[in-house]
Each structure stands twice: as structure tokens, then as C-alpha cells.
Swiss-Prot record:
The gene is easA. Changing residue 123 to E: In strain: P1 / 1029/N5. Pfam families: Oxidored_FMN. This is Probable inactive dehydrogenase easA. Belongs to the NADH:flavin oxidoreductase/NADH oxidase family. It comes from Claviceps purpurea (Ergot fungus). Gene3D superfamilies: Aldolase class I (3.20.20.70). SUPFAM superfamilies: FMN-linked oxidoreductases. GO terms for molecular function: FMN binding; NADPH dehydrogenase activity.
């Protein structure tokens, strides 16, 4: 049995986690055509909640119809979607675990057909396409920006007060709408929403303030991916000062946690970027401090996760490790890591099959876990 600091308890929002292994938010296209979570989703999250005291973060969830930028992604508006999510939440809570919903708006990164089929258009911080040859979005006007802020707030209320989520994670990463305002590679505005570090930060910070006011500071997290070049991001000259300012403001709001993602594909495209002193987010981790949890994602496996918490950040108890692909194929992942049990391999071909349980809820638990099935849940 492992004695790694991965398996020490940590305060998190209004709860206490039994370990530091977190389910990553992952888009899997398992909602129906209207964005209502299918029953597969309840099974998926319940399986991964089976080790008591686990933290789960959901798929990216559209906050309103115009932010649903892809088919078969879930939403959190209207009573039918809220009710379906409540079933998921109740099942997770019955296992003794915790679940936070990720609030999402796609902006220029949306699938154009998914919008135009509903009479909607691409919108972003500026008229800058996600890549050369891709459709050019409209620059959102002042009224639209204010409405987006309200939509995030309502989405948070629907999640926490309606569906019973333990909190919400605001998706500010991976080139989606908040990132499109935050980074000058996309944001070319000259009004109060662009043109300076402070102005580019304004959209994400106003959203965060509104959500904090709506559901409480200890129910709000933020995900960022400073170094990701996915969807046209990560190429600005003042990247470190931009994110230093943004993270400082988040810290002052006393939100529950910060989630930082490193990008494996950035390293594959440009291995030299690894030599930048801030590439692995150490500067931002230090800025965040030791008071509140910080989630770190970036292709971790069991060995690198242990090194992260036991060596790199051995001086702090607030670093949690986010797993995606390995959690897909190992619903009992925390148990396997603690007991030193080999991981099952994942199948990429089944990651994104719409409306299907294949490769989603059909990975088995290990025999050692099942031998304890008479317990309500396995202690983390």
C-alpha cells in the first residue's frame, strides 16, 4: 500500500477530500441532441466516485443555448437538464464523493454547423479566426458581453442551487471564450475589454466576481492553460505578466481553487518550449500560495504524480493531480494507485463516440476492488 502524500486528506471548498487524485473535465459527447445528460453519464460519474472522498469535475457544460458549440455536449439551462444533472450529483454524493460542474462557453472555437443549424453565429473577443482559413467570428458588443456574464452567473446558480453540485469550475482554458479575451493572440480590442493586461483580464474577472457573489467564494474554481497553443493560444509576448495579474486577482477573491493545465501537444509541436523557466507553471503555483488547493494537469501517470506531490511540491499539502485518460479506463483509479495495481489501457477510438456507453462505462473494476464490494465504498 502506498504511503505517498497523494493519499493524505486535503480541505477543499466546504469539504475534505480523502486523497489528491482528481477526475479531469473531459468532453465525451454523451448528452442527447438537446444537451440533456444521458443515463450513461450518471453511470460514468458514479463509477469514478466509488472511492469515497474523491473529487470529480464534469465535462465542459454549456451555460446557455448559444454557448453549446458542439453536438451532444451537455448544458445546464432549463429544468430538464438541471434535473438530469441532479441525478448525477445525487449518485456521486451517495458514494461519499464530490462533484463540481465546469461552466463553458466556446466562442470562436465552436463547430460552425452546430451554431448555424440553430440560427446562431460565431462570436469572440475580436474578429480573429481560430486558425488561418477558419471562419471569422464577430466581435461581441457591449450588450452581448454583459449578457455572457449574466449567463455564467445563472449557470452557476443552476448547478449549485438547482442540481446540488458542490461547486463550479469556470473554464478559462484551452482557447475557449474566456481565454479568447485573456490572450492578445485573439483579443485585439481597444475598449475596456482589451488593449492592456488589466482590460484583457476584465471579462474573466467580472464573470468570476458574479459567480462568487451568486454561489459563494468557496464553491468557485478557475481553470487556466497559460502555455497551451491549442486553438490559437499561448503565443503572446507578455504571457507570464498577463497570467500573473489574472491569478493575483483570483487569489484576492479567495476562490476555492486554481486549476492549471500543461499541454502535452505543445511539447510535441515545439519541444524547446520546455526550456522556458515558467513552462511547468512553477511561478504560478508559487504565486497561488499554500492556503488554497491548486489542481495540476498535464499527462500525469502514477509515477510522475507521486513525484509531483512527494518531491517537486513536498513542502505543501495543497497540490492535487488531475487525471484524464487513465481515469477513463480505470474507474477505480485512486484504489489502483494506492494499492500499486497495474492500470488498464485506454482506447482512443472510443473517446468521442456520441451517445454511446462503449469506451465510457464498460471498463471493469479490478478484482481487488470488487472483493471489497460488500462495503458501501472503499475508503480513500
Amino acid at each position: 500500500m502506498s504511503t505517498s502524500n497523494l493519499f493524505s486528506t486535503v480541505p477543499f471548498g466546504k469539504n475534505v477530500l480523502n486523497h489528491k487524485i482528481v477526475l479531469s473535465p473531459m468532453t465525451r459527447f454523451r448528452a442527447d441532441d438537446n444537451g440533456v445528460p444521458l443515463s450513461y453519464m450518471k453511470t460514468f460519474y458514479a463509477q469514478r466516485a466509488s472511492v469515497r472522498g474523491t473529487l470529480l469535475v464534469t465535462d465542459a457544460v454549456a451555460i446557455c443555448p448559444r454557448t453549446k458549440g458542439f453536438p451532444n455536449v451537455p448544458g445546464i439551462w432549463h429544468k430538464d437538464r438541471i434535473a438530469a444533472w441532479k441525478e448525477v450529483v445525487d449518485e456521486v454524493h451517495s458514494k461519499g464523493s464530490f462533484i463540481w460542474l465546469q461552466l463553458w462557453a466556446t466562442g470562436r472555437a465552436a463547430d460552425l454547423e452546430a451554431l448555424t443549424s440553430r440560427g446562431l453565429k460565431l462570436g469572440s473577443s475580436s474578429e480573429v479566426p481560430v486558425a488561418p482559413g477558419e471562419p471569422t467570428p464577430r466581435a461581441l458588443d457591449e450588450d452581448e458581453i454583459q449578457q455572457y456574464i449574466l449567463d455564467y452567473v445563472q449557470g452557476a446558480k443552476n448547478a449549485v442551487h438547482g442540481a446540488g453540485f458542490d461547486g463550479v469550475e469556470i473554464h478559462g482554458a484551452n482557447g475557449f471564450l474566456i481565454d479568447q479575451f485573456l490572450q492578445s493572440s485573439c483579443n485585439r480590442r481597444t475598449d475596456q475589454w482589451g488593449g492592456s493586461i488589466e482590460n484583457r483580464s476584465r471579462f474573466g474577472l467580472e464573470i468570476t466576481r458574479g459567480v462568487v457573489d451568486a454561489v459563494g467564494h468557496d464553491r468557485v474554481g478557475m481553470k487556466l492553460s497559460p502555455w497551451s497553443t491549442f486553438q490559437g493560444m499561448g503565443t503572446m509576448d507578455d504571457l507570464v505578466p498577463q497570467f500573473e495579474h489574472f491569478i493575483t486577482c483570483l487569489r484576492e477573491m479567495d476562490i476555492a481553487y486554481l486549476h492549471l493545465a500543461n499541454s502535452r501537444w505543445v511539447e510535441e509541436e515545439d519541444p524547446s518550449i520546455r526550456t522556458h523557466p515558467d513552462f511547468h507553471n512553477q511561478t504560478f503555483v508559487q504565486m497561488w500560495g499554500k492556503k488554497r488547493p491548486i489542481l495540476l494537469a498535464g499527462g500525469y501517470d502514477p509515477d510522475s504524480a507521486r513525484r509531483l506531490v512527494d518531491q517537486t511540491y513536498s513542502d505543501r499539502n495543497n497540490v492535487l493531480v488531475v487525471f484524464g485518460r487513465h481515469y477513463i479506463s480505470n474507474p477505480d483509479l485512486p484504489f489502483r494507485l494506492r494499492m500499486g495495481i497495474a492500470l488498464q489501457k485506454y482506447n482512443r477510438d472510443t473517446f468521442y463516440i456520441p451517445c454511446s456507453g462503449e469506451g465510457y462505462v464498460d471498463y471493469p473494476f479490478c478484482k481487488e476492488y470488487l472483493d471489497q464490494a460488500d462495503e458501501a465504498a472503499v475508503a480513500g
